């Protein structure tokens, strides 16, 4: 990516952070990531050996984790937010992240860190057409040339730009990129006890 120079510095920084979270941190949830940051390995937790000030600091950090968990409503999957300014190339960045996941998922199919399908939300139906850039741009600008054939042969795009458009994805299929607006997504029950999270993420390692 740095050799080709197609991505801008904010895109490169965000992508490197994404890879770091996936490969070094092991694809943690936000709560787990914060827990590691607040309580690094080796942090003394023995009450008898801590000062009152240290105990108060630990208490405050634990309260932060509890508040974070409440805010996230106990989400059991990574839910990171990458905030980039307008015009910095968020669409291309999303595509790069998706391609990275798909390529690694192909090489390591049992590794649950890497997604095998992607769902891209647009804030409104008018934005969906602009997201076709994910499909149309030159993949070799963001991935090594030897992987472009794999992507062009296996990617399946689904644009749900109309209310009447139905999603037709084969159960168990991989490398689907579904682009829709938030109003369009309807989670179908797969069982009497299913909920939205279970439907979107039935088995984490298969995503």
Q: What are these language model-derived features?
A:
Residues 1-207:
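RecA-like P-loop NTPase motor core of helicase/translocase proteins
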